[in-house]
Regions:
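N-terminal secretory signal peptides that target proteins for export/translocation
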Residues: 1-12
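Hydrophobic alpha-helical transmembrane bundles of multi-pass membrane proteins
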Residues: 12-20, 25-392
Length: 393
């Protein structure tokens, strides 16, 4: 009985071996046939869809980080002013994003990316004008959101410089002007095909001065524009009551919470990792990833150097380190490196941050004591002056 079973099992194994030997070469042939199949157009389209999807997600993620800078600005401004005016400042920061977003979508976006040398032809509700700008397949609506948060950043810079003495109704008027005219025109000149034409060889700058204008993420377009508007606004409004004595000397009006201000700077620092690296607008290729990583590094180094050298300069100048000036030094370094963060070396980023941190200290002193312009948060020095220091030509 055992012999019979053994023979039966041997026959079964032989049958299985025969089947495997017969089918195995066929599977190899089938694999060879598959490997020789050419890549179809549908495969290329699928790859392009993945690339576009990654780029879109990166752009929208960066937009969310920049949007998160709004509470950062609100906390910095609230911390640097007196308690009684906190609600007013917070309301202004809220309204300039809400109101400004609608205005920029309705008018500003068309002015910024329309056709023209000095100003774009407006296209109300017509997002098709972006076909000539978006050359990597990014959705137009997504790019609109990305530019909207940049516009909101330019608008909210002014709020702090004019704090504690601006009527809410007049602030609404200002929001209209910067959202539908000032920022769109500034952006059109540089990023929308205007006369500066960011980095283009045949631009007005090249033809007249023999060099190109480079502003990667908005050191001039966003921060410098907002900073100079802040300076003019503060000068027109005049100082707060009690800021200057009868002899003309400046009197300190301390803010009510450096804790809020410090938290706000950390939030802004975090949001800047969307502001600068996000301006690459793509993250799918190796080149994009290299640029993004480099911009992350230069942005962080400039912030650290700006804060450190502002701390050192304030310590030497006033005999003790100043937290408020150190916080503004961090922001000064971030603003300064924004234009050329994609081009400068890490050492160059440290130098830019150091210069901006030191210049900011003396700029605040000059505006306060010499020009006698009352800027409670130092916005004109941080954004206006330092925004001019790193424009790449």
């Amino acid at each position: 009985m055992d012999t019979t079973n053994r023979k039966g099992m041997e026959k079964l194994y032989l049958k299985r071996l025969f089947i495997l030997l017969f089918l195995f070469p066929a599977s190899l042939w089938a694999q060879d046939a598959l490997s020789e199949t050419p890549v179809r157009s549908t495969d290329t389209e699928a790859i392009n869809e993945i690339v576009t999807g990654l780029n879109t997600v990166w752009m929208l993620l960066a937009a969310m980080l920049v949007f998160f800078m709004q509470p950062g600005f609100a906390l910095v401004e609230a911390g640097f002013i007196r308690t009684k005016n906190t609600a007013n400042v917070l309301m202004k920061n809220l309204i300039d994003f809400m109101f400004g977003s609608i205005l920029f979508w309705f008018i500003g976006f068309g002015l910024m990316f329309g056709v023209g040398v000095f100003v774009g032809t407006p296209h109300f509700f017509n997002l098709d004008i972006m076909d000539k700008v978006i050359d990597n397949g990014l959705p137009i609506e997504g790019f609109l959101i990305f530019q909207t948060v940049f516009c909101a950043t330019a608008a909210t810079i002014v709020s702090g410089a004019m704090a504690e003495r601006t009527k809410f109704s007049m602030y609404l008027v200002y929001t209209i002007f910067i959202s539908v005219l000032i920022y769109p025109v500034s952006g059109h000149w540089t990023w929308g095909g205007g006369w500066l034409m960011n980095g283009e060889e045949n631009s007005f700058m090249t033809n007249i001065f023999g060099t190109t204008f480079h502003d990667f993420a908005g050191s001039t377009v966003v921060h410098s524009v907002g900073g100079w508007i802040a300076l003019v606004g503060a000068a027109v409004l005049g100082p707060r009551i009690g800021k200057y004595g009868k002899d003309g000397r400046s009197k300190a009006i301390p803010g009510h919470s450096l804790t809020l201000a410090c938290l706000g700077v950390f939030i802004l620092w975090f949001g800047w990792f969307g502001f600068n690296p996000g301006s690459q607008l793509a993250a799918a290729t190796g080149t994009d990833q290299t640029v993004i990583s480099h911009v992350f590094l230069t942005t962080n180094l400039a912030a650290c150097a700006g804060g450190f050298f502002a701390l050192t300069a304030s310590w030497i100048k006033y005999g003790k380190p100043s937290l408020s000036l150190t916080l503004n030094g961090v922001l000064a370094g971030l603003v300064g490196v924004t234009a050329g963060c994609d081009l400068v070396s890490p050492f160059g980023a440290v130098m830019i941050g150091a210069i901006c941190g030191i210049v900011m200290i003396f700029s605040v002193d000059f505006i306060d004591h010499i020009l006698k312009i009352d800027d409670p948060v130092g916005a004109s020095s941080v954004h206006g002056v330092c925004g001019c220091l790193d424009r790449k030509s």
